[in-house]
Regions:
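Bacterial N-terminal signal peptides that target proteins for export
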Residues: 1-12
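C-terminal motif of bacterial Sec signal peptides marking the signal peptidase cleavage site
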Residues: 19-23
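Short, low-complexity, glycine-enriched hydrophobic/amphipathic alpha-helices that associate
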Residues: 26-88
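Extracytoplasmic/secreted proteins, especially bacterial periplasmic and envelope-associated proteins
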Residues: 37, 42-46, 50, 65-66, ...
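Amphipathic, membrane-active segments
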Residues: 83-114
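Short, solvent-exposed beta-strand/turn patches at coil↔beta or beta↔helix junctions
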Residues: 102-134, 154-161
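Periplasmic peptidoglycan-binding/anchoring modules of Gram-negative envelope and division proteins
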Residues: 118-151, 175, 210-212, 217, ...
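Periplasmic OmpA-like peptidoglycan-binding domain that tethers envelope proteins to the cell wall
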Residues: 153-228
């Protein structure tokens, strides 16, 4: 299981942008099997500009390596179809979660309104959250040829250092649950955390803070899936 810590605003912006892109109606409703290779020219280019240009600088390269580049051509069509099916399965199993397709991957957002949440200043997985993570682990078992990036966030209440540690512990708790309790391979998971530095809502309101206390999961095709898709496409 790989973990890394990066606090720069640039990387935080990358994940904020992922969520922002995913919440656009056009991105949410588009079928990636139909789009095929052209997805690389849209949001993939944005992610490449933010993350890819900083490979090797302050650890950002590892984050970029986890997300990877968009696979184009016929292989991209095949991968898009598989990831579409996985995203649909997750939506069916966990209707409360926010599930969006971004490039070749899937971004899931769990906050206090979607079943996976933490008590104030706590990072243990409660029984209600376990039930949701159990459903997601079943989907991850059904689709084994993916890697998973788990990202923790907090609201702005409390000291910056405390929130950074708290977001780290929460993200690692989710990863540990998948690996230690559900038996998923640790090699599939990378854990990251941003404390309060990447909010998606207004921290001055109770509703906004609840949305910012969240965990994101980015599910991306692994090299096995990519290589098989290239072989099937004759590329």
């Amino acid at each position: 299981m790989k973990t890394f810590f990066k606090q720069t605003a640039l990387v935080a912006l990358a994940f904020t942008l992922i969520i922002s892109l995913g919440s656009c109606e056009a991105t949410r409703n588009a079928n990636n099997k139909q789009k095929g290779a052209v997805i690389g020219a849209a949001s993939g280019a944005i992610l490449g500009a933010i993350i890819g240009n900083n490979v090797g600088k302050g650890g950002n390269g590892e984050l970029g390596a986890v997300i990877g580049g968009v696979v184009g051509g016929g292989a991209g069509v095949l991968i898009g179809s598989k990831m579409d099916k996985q995203a649909q399965k997750i939506e069916q199993e966990i209707p409360g979660a926010e599930v969006v397709r971004v490039d070749d991957g899937i971004v899931i957002t769990f906050d206090e309104n979607s079943g996976v949440y933490f008590d104030t200043a706590k990072y243990n997985i409660n029984s209600a959250s376990q039930a949701i993570l159990d459903k997601l682990s079943n989907v991850l078992m059904e689709y084994p040829d993916t890697d998973v990036l788990v990202v923790g966030h907090t609201d702005s209440v409390g000291a910056d250092e405390m929130n950074m540690t708290l977001s780290k512990n929460r993200a690692q708790s989710v990863t540990n649950y998948f690996v230690q309790s559900k038996g998923l391979s640790s090699g599939r998971f990378t854990t990251n955390w941003f404390g309060e530095t990447a909010p998606v809502a207004d921290n001055t309101t109770a509703e906004g803070r609840a949305k910012n206390r969240r965990v994101n999961l980015a599910i991306v095709p692994n090299e096995k899936m990519k290589n098989e898709a290239r072989q099937q496409a004759g590329e």
